[in-house]
Every structure is written in structure tokens, then in C-alpha cells.
Regions:
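Histidine/acidic-residue-rich catalytic or RNA/ligand-binding cores of hydrolases
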Residues: 13, 114-127, 180-196, 232-236, ...
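Active-site neighborhood of phospho(di)ester-bond hydrolases with catalytic His/Asp-centered motifs
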Residues: 47-48, 77, 109, 177, ...
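Aromatic-lined glycan-binding groove of carbohydrate-active enzymes
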Residues: 106, 110-120, 161-212
Length: 287
């Protein structure tokens, strides 16, 4: 199972843009600490944070060390810093190529956006009613934050498709973690519609398949306890959906399996096998 460095990650990210040397040193310490923690149990797959926003050269150095340390899962940002090129720019091809060559899984996670985490503008919450603050947690603290938490991931993944990165690196795998899952069904439809609408207005020649086919081939997603698992599995998510508990965080509830199973009374055993086991194995490219 995948282990994330949530509290320590927030401390490191606080130095981003303040002191590059301290920030990159903190990234290395973060990765080393999680490597050491997970080394006692081979079933724990720690995530090495690769700071794409620090630039290609710095990110490649961290990536090479993570590969040497034996990491199999990489955590990345979704949105590049201001005045910097997209992570889909050809400058970043060496990073995607190295990840594909090493057969590593990439994961996106709530809060790891490349900028201060704020799923909705503060102004939308200034409505005259009491509300939970956005800050101090990467978990969605209110209904509006829940609605907006996956937007950055959608944009990043759409760029990976429309800019041809998934076409160029066809075995690259990306998991979307703790950002919900129900949205991905309509998102695939919107991807295909966007491609049809703009393929004659802009150069989308690097998109050789339906955009949703890249999703099916290269993306996995985890639901929150309480989402309708059977509906997602039977409406296009059969090969996308992976079980996650979010242990020990409260978002997973004290019985995530029970919550999931309440929505799976009509789910076939082959689909359950994909949800609980096979799709995760596909993400980490395990036999």
C-alpha cells in the first residue's frame, strides 16, 4: 500500500519560493525519512516527492536519487509556478522518459498542487454564513472545497493528454489519490467533446486516440468512502477505480470497506477484484 508524508510534506512546502537550498534539502530529507520508515515493511510503498516546480535539473537530481533508493511511487505537483513552463513542455520530457523507463507510478494527491492549497477562492466562502476555513488542512473542510478539490488534477491530466505526453510515453501511469472519483466519468466525456470541438481550431495532432482512451490506459483514481462504487465501476470506471482507506486520516472513516460495500451489493466479483486488487497492481506495474 502507498504511504504519503502528509504532515512533513506541509513543512517542506512552506519553504518553496523562500529559500531554494533549504527547500531542496528538505525534499531530500523528506524522501529519505519516508524511505527509512517504509523500509521495515516491504508492503509499504513510500512516495518520493519530485519537485517539478523547482525546474528540470533539480527535479531530475531528486528523481535519480529516488530511483537509487528504490522508490516505486512518485508524488508530484499539478500546477507549475507562475512564469514557468507547463510540466508537459518538451523541457520536461527527460523526466517523463526516466519515470517510464524505471516503471515508476506517479501519484497526484490533495494539497500537492504546486501552490498554496486553496480549492475555491476565499471570496466564494465570504457569504455571510459561518463556514469552515480552507487553511490548515488538505482535507476538504466544507462542501464548496469538496466540489473544487479535483479541478487542478483535471487540468493537469487534460494537459498530459492534449499536449501529447501520454501519447509519447504510453506506459506512464498516474494515480489520483484523495480527490474523489465520481467526477472522472463525466470528465472523460468532456475530454472527448473538447477534442471534437477544437481539433480543427488548434494543433491536436499529437492526440492519436480518443482522449478518454488515454484515461482508460494510463490513469487510476481512488474514491472517498461514501461514493457509489458500483455506479462508477459500471459507468466507465471498471479499469480506473482503486480501493483506498486514507488510514489513519478521518476522511476514510472507521470502516471504509463497510462504507464501500454498502454501494456494491450488485457488483460482480470480477469488478470487485479490479477495485480491491487488480487496478492497484496495474498502477504500480506489479504482476
Amino acid at each position: 500500500y502507498i504511504v504519503f508524508p502528509t504532515p512533513a510534506f506541509d513543512q517542506i512546502i512552506a519553504m518553496r519560493g523562500v529559500d531554494d537550498e533549504v527547500y531542496l534539502g528538505g525534499v531530500e530529507a523528506l524522501n529519505q525519512g519516508l524511505h527509512d520508515f517504509c523500509s521495515v515493511d516491504k508492503s509499504m510503498l513510500g512516495t518520493a516527492y519530485i519537485p517539478l516546480g523547482a525546474g528540470v535539473d533539480s527535479a531530475l537530481k531528486v528523481l535519480e536519487r529516488a530511483i537509487h533508493q528504490g522508490f516505486r511511487v512518485l508524488l508530484i505537483d499539478t500546477i507549475p509556478p507562475k512564469n514557468q513552463v507547463s510540466f508537459t513542455h518538451p523541457d520536461y520530457y527527460p523526466i517523463w522518459a526516466r519515470i517510464q523507463e524505471a516503471q515508476l507510478a506517479v501519484v497526484l494527491h490533495i494539497g500537492a498542487t504546486g501552490a498554496p492549497y486553496k480549492p475555491v477562492p476565499d471570496e466564494l466562502l465570504d457569504n455571510g454564513n459561518p463556514h469552515s476555513p480552507q487553511a490548515h488542512s488538505d482535507a476538504p473542510p466544507n462542501a464548496m472545497s469538496y466540489m473544487g478539490m479535483h479541478y487542478n488534477a483535471e487540468l493537469f491530466l487534460a494537459a498530459m493528454i492534449f499536449d501529447g505526453v501520454f501519447e509519447r510515453f504510453p506506459t506512464l501511469k498516474i494515480g489520483v489519490v484523495e480527490l474523489g472519483a465520481s467526477w472522472i466519468i463525466s470528465w472523460m466525456q468532456r475530454l472527448d467533446q473538447a477534442h471534437r470541438a477544437f481539433r480543427k481550431l488548434q494543433d491536436l495532432s499529437q492526440v492519436k486516440m480518443k482522449p478518454s482512451d488515454y484515461v482508460q490506459r494510463q490513469i487510476k483514481v481512488t474514491p472517498f468512502a461514501g461514493e457509489d462504487i458500483d455506479w462508477i465501476l459500471t459507468h466507465g470506471g471498471e479499469d480506473l477505480l482503486m480501493f483506498a482507506s486514507d488510514y489513519p486520516h478521518h476522511e476514510g472513516t472507521d470502516d471504509p470497506i463497510g462504507r464501500f460495500e454498502k454501494t456494491m451489493s450488485n457488483t460482480s466479483e470480477p469488478l470487485k477484484q479490479k477495485f480491491y486488487t487488480d487496478n492497484f497492481k496495474s498502477l504500480i506495474q506489479a504482476s
